[in-house]
UniProtKB/Swiss-Prot annotation:
The basic functional RuBisCO is composed of a large chain homodimer in a 'head-to-tail' conformation. In form I RuBisCO this homodimer is arranged in a barrel-like tetramer with the small subunits forming a tetrameric 'cap' on each end of the 'barrel'. Substrate binds at N113, T163, K167, R285, H317, S369. Pfam families: RuBisCO_large, RuBisCO_large_N. Belongs to the RuBisCO large chain family. Type I subfamily. Heterohexadecamer of 8 large chains and 8 small chains; disulfide-linked. The disulfide link is formed within the large subunit homodimers. This is Ribulose bisphosphate carboxylase large chain. It catalyses: 2 (2R)-3-phosphoglycerate + 2 H(+) = D-ribulose 1,5-bisphosphate + CO2 + H2O; D-ribulose 1,5-bisphosphate + O2 = 2-phosphoglycolate + (2R)-3-phosphoglycerate + 2 H(+). The modification N6-carboxylysine is found at K191. GO terms for molecular function: magnesium ion binding; monooxygenase activity; ribulose-bisphosphate carboxylase activity. The keyword Transmembrane helix does not apply. SUPFAM superfamilies: RuBisCo, C-terminal domain, RuBisCO, large subunit, small (N-terminal) domain. Its EC number is 4.1.1.39. Keywords: Calvin cycle, Carbon dioxide fixation, Chloroplast, Disulfide bond, Lyase, Magnesium, Metal-binding, Methylation, Monooxygenase, Oxidoreductase, Photorespiration, Photosynthesis, Plastid.
Amino acid sequence: VGFKAGVKDYKLTYYTPDYETKDTDILAAFRVSPQPGVPPEEAGAAVAAESSTGTWTTVWTDGLTSLDRYKGRCYHIEPVAGEENQYIAYVAYPLDLFEEGSVTNMFTSIVGNVFGFKALRALRLEDLRIPTAYVKTFQGPPHGIQVERDKLNKYGRPLLGCTIKPKLGLSAKNYGRAVYECLRGGLDFTKDDENVNSQPFMRWRDRFVFCAEAIYKAQAETGEIKGHYLNATAGTCEEMMKRAIFARELGVPIVMHDYLTGGFTANTSLAHYCRDNGLLLHIHRAMHAVIDRQKNHGIHFRVLAKALRMSGGDHIHAGTVVGKLEGERDITLGFVDLLRDDFIEKDRSRGIYFTQDWVSLPGVLPVASGGIHVWHMPALTEIFGDDSVLQFGGGTLGHPWGNAPGAVANRVALEACVQARNEGRDLAREGNEIIREASKWSPELAAACEVWKEIKFEF
């Protein structure tokens, strides 16, 4: 008697092509590139095993539990068109394998160990289906799109932001001055750069105080609600919370966090604090390209975006689309919808492998940021629609007349695009014309159009 010791093929236990997925299963789509000679079924089963209950050999303690209840299952494998020896392996995980309300545990289980696996040349997590039963264990974004609009009293248009540059080296007072000029000119938000934390040339508390002063001055002057994303990211969770608490004491509307470098545990704690204390939370995705840039290894950004919506954030950076290829546009809009909408249909052309129901979890505003300027405004307005934040760093501060006129130019361009769209004009076709018309009655915009007329970021 006893049990049958020894090494056996994963696929005997973990490859179950006739498995019917349950509504409570977490489903994963992996792009698997097996080593030469490893059959795809074995590779897919190995992924299912190593990311759930399996280990490399049969163990005595397997008999003390019900593997059938707890094991991950590879239930479908399809070859990737146009790629040699590459497959999409679909894996179903029983819900009981995961701790409630912990993105950290979800990732530790699904991607924690299996990516270094010898039988695979490369492995990429393309998408996750989060079952409603699991979604309901997360708070999600502190406030969401609708509550944010109500807090800011801004409707029917995208919001405008600007990252303060030079990102490192300004003193706190000069930094606050730059913030004030941008907000006074017509932006809704300014932003700490992701690597502005608390350095010798500008300690966090000084920056917070001067930025708060800038916000209040600009609000008094413009009659609009303003914000500055105060970066609370720090070396310890305690220090991060200290910064968030100080921001709340100053009465500012929004703080910021780098969720990948800071980690999901810290991010979820901060998101809970933000909801309890009425702070909006802006999320920067520093480090994402380390994880998502390789096409055949790592984790696709749409998974990191889903994870952020569960962990909590009101804004997240999501790429700009402009000047890039058409295909990328569909993929980007796919995960932008995953961030904003309540229900998203499976659509492989947009990279969405599973239908996702968020069961009323609040939405996240996508942030378009990086290398954009006034000439991009029509395209951005058309692509992202109203529920987005458009961030022009150099596109504001690079204005020949300074920050405030740079902000004016962006605001005029945005209002012109929104008005044109509402009048039924085609932003994609008439975009340049709309900006040209608007620049006739805005010298600030005309100057911006001059500076950036030739710039294109196409490689």
